[in-house]
Amino acid sequence: ERMQSIAYTYALMPALKKLYPDKEDLKDIIEKNKDELFSEIAQEINNDNVTDIEWDGYNLWITELGIGSYISGKELSDRYVENVSIKLANIMGVSFNRSRPILEANTEKLRISIWHESRCHKKSMSIRKIPEYLRFSHKDLVESDYAPESIINLLENSVTAHLSIVVGGQPHAGKTELVKYLSTKIPHNEKAGVYEDNQEIHYRKINPNKKCVEFFVDDKVTYQDIIKAGLRHNIDWILLSESRGPEVAHLLNSLSTGSYCMTTMHLDEVRDMPDRMYNMLGNSSVNERFINSVYKYIDLVVLVECDKHEKRRIKQIGFLSRCNSVNHCCVIYEDGTFTDETVPEDILDKFKRRGIKNIYEKVN
């Protein structure tokens, strides 16, 4: 009877949502029913070192910090996976069948994707955990060989110097985690505009009492819309969890008016970042000076990587600069060593204006 009652409640949720739109939102409903929804994977959900939980229909794959990706000895029952799918579909108020074979749901802590068995033999489920806290401190980064302390100091000082920063890398490399850490160095009275389609940065929770506004984008209000609107909302720092499309043109336009940014993007090489950003424009009509604007308004590019054991590190550090109508990309750190390239003078001037004489020494 209890299971029937629970199933009935789940079935009613879409209708209740329409009748009572001011009640708990869908994310809260999923979060509050987490223990029941994820009963067979509760141990993995509650383990802070686990970043991803994936069921391919045959094996349960776990990705864990310091260990990597491995097959768990646990096997999920078909009935359990079916029930999770039905309950999530009911909560979201969507169909999940051969015609609509992709089911996605998000909370503040979890990003869930399930594929229907009509398209992949058995149901496939992927859960990415989004921590609401910082995974590391300055000390943790140094002790874990994430990068030399001088590089960590450089990154922190770059925020103080108001450099616009792009963190690149492949999926699972820890791009957003680095942005979250660097966001703690933004002064409390400088307004951060955090624009996301799925909550990942958690700026307000990580930085309580700092000046900020968090805005969720969708098909109705896009990244382009909110970046443009931010110009009239006194935004000092634009934080994008990921740059992936034509919104980069509006981002650069905002930077040209005096804002600063932190964002992530998929990237293999620091030197490729300007071309990568240009390719994001798609068929958008922009003038041929776009690449020049990238070099002028993006200051620092960081490439992070992750090995098979989920050990993360900084692979490259590069500065972009445009002086005397010439574009420069100076990679000063690569594969664990400093190169013989020097930081551009116009970048050094930005540090000096904030009272930072040695960019590699910790301030305060």
Q: What name fits each language-model region?
A:
Residues 167-169:
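Hydrophobic anchor at the beta1->P-loop junction of P-loop NTPases
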Residues 175:
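Conserved lysine of the Walker
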Residues 172:
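Walker A (P-loop) phosphate-binding loop of P-loop NTPases
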Residues 1-96, 107:
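N-terminal accessory targeting/assembly segments
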Residues 16-35, 39-40, 309-364:
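NTP-binding/hydrolysis catalytic cores, primarily Walker-type P-loop NTPases
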Residues 165, 183-293:
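Switch/coupling sub-region of P-loop NTPases
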Residues 178, 182:
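Hydrophobic positions on the alpha1 helix immediately C-terminal to the Walker A/P-loop
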